[in-house]
């Protein structure tokens, strides 16, 4: 009984509260706010998320805000406890290779060994399993459009039917921007190689082992792996758990918040306490009524 009273007294103290909060942040969940529109369609600017820190193992604990590791990376994989790897199509929170303190959220398009094409039509995926299993694509992507390049079958937009928030602009602006960068000698600003494939200009990349090709659902308004490269497992942080609060921001185009200040900082009640899957159900329901 005395021990329990001591534990209660410690937990009730300022020091105990700080220790408990840090332990939760280190090993269970951490709060983030989405500032940009790269995942619009699924996650919006102003969505405030709890991120599940144990989805892909336990990352090396870091002190919040200053992102200072509290212990060495003994395994050199960014994780205290190694776990599952992100699967294709999952939404993942990570630190991109060109940053040290910023957290991004994108959808994992491809895993190590996969080949990716970005064309004027959109993204194509060649899963590495199909190199040894000729029926792999037919089994796993039965209704998808496919195209043959270099003697290999690639799947067009493999996650778009399952995840309705994924979308492109009509003229695929990002493809033309990348083409312009590549032809003007600015290849250092993109991670994919511009090649001619069967008379068509395409961007190509093969994903390294234990790396992941992360793309925003808002395909034409996203800084992602097309530009700064694939993400190593050591940079993987976790997965979105649920939206605990959501506000419209100045850049909320759907509400014309930039031109109408009264539309800023409005609560999006319908998004609160929804997981990514829950938000996608709302999208499917809205699409069915239009």
UniProtKB/Swiss-Prot annotation:
Residues that span the membrane, as ranges: 14-34
Gene Ontology BP annotations: signal peptide processing
InterPro entries cross-referenced by the UniProt entry: LexA/Signal_pep-like_sf (IPR036286), Pept_S26A_signal_pept_1 (IPR000223), Pept_S26A_signal_pept_1_CS (IPR019758), Peptidase_S26 (IPR019533)
GO cellular component, one term: plasma membrane
Alphabetized SUPFAM superfamilies for the sequence: LexA/Signal peptidase (SSF51306)
Keywords of the record: Cell membrane, Hydrolase, Membrane, Protease, Transmembrane, Transmembrane helix
Active site: 38, 106
UniProt topological domain (Cytoplasmic) ranges: 1-13
Catalysed reaction, written as an equation: Cleavage of hydrophobic, N-terminal signal or leader sequences from secreted and periplasmic proteins
GO molecular function, one term: serine-type endopeptidase activity
Annotated EC: 3.4.21.89
Residues in compartment: Extracellular: 35-290
Subcellular locations according to the entry: Cell membrane
Membrane topology: Single-pass type II membrane protein
PANTHER family, alphabetized: CHLOROPLAST PROCESSING PEPTIDASE, SIGNAL PEPTIDASE I
Family recorded in the similarity comment: Belongs to the peptidase S26 family.
Protein's recorded name: Signal peptidase I
Species: Helicobacter pylori (strain ATCC 700392 / 26695) (Campylobacter pylori)
């Amino acid at each position: 009984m005395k021990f329990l009273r001591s534990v209660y007294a410690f937990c009730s103290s300022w020091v105990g509260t700080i220790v408990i909060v840090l332990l939760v942040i280190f090993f269970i969940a951490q709060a983030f706010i989405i500032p940009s529109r790269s995942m619009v369609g699924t996650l919006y600017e102003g969505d405030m998320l709890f991120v599940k820190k144990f989805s892909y193992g336990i990352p090396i604990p870091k002190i919040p805000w200053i992102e200072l590791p509290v212990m060495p990376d003994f395994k050199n994989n960014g994780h205290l406890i190694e776990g599952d790897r992100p699967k294709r199509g999952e939404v993942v929170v990570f630190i991109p290779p060109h940053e040290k303190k910023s957290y991004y959220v994108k959808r994992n398009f491809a895993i190590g060994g996969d080949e990716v094409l970005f064309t004027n039509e959109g993204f194509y995926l060649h899963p590495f399993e199909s190199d040894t299993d000729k029926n792999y694509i037919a089994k796993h992507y039965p209704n998808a459009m496919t195209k043959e390049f270099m003697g290999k079958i690639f799947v067009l937009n493999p996650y778009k039917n399952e995840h309705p928030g994924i979308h492109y602009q009509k003229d695929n602006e990002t493809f033309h921007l990348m083409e312009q960068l590549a032809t003007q000698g600015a290849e250092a600003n993109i991670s994919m190689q511009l090649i001619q494939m069967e008379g068509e200009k395409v961007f190509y990349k093969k994903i390294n082992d234990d790396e992941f090709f992360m793309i925003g659902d808002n395909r034409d308004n996203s800084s992602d792996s097309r530009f700064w490269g694939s993400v190593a497992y050591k940079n993987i942080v976790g997965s979105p758990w649920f939206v605990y609060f959501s506000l419209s921001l100045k850049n909320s185009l759907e509400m014309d918040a930039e031109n109408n200040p009264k539309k800023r900082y409005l609560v999006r009640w319908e998004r609160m306490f929804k997981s990514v899957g829950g938000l996608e159900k709302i999208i499917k329901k809205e699409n069915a009524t239009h």
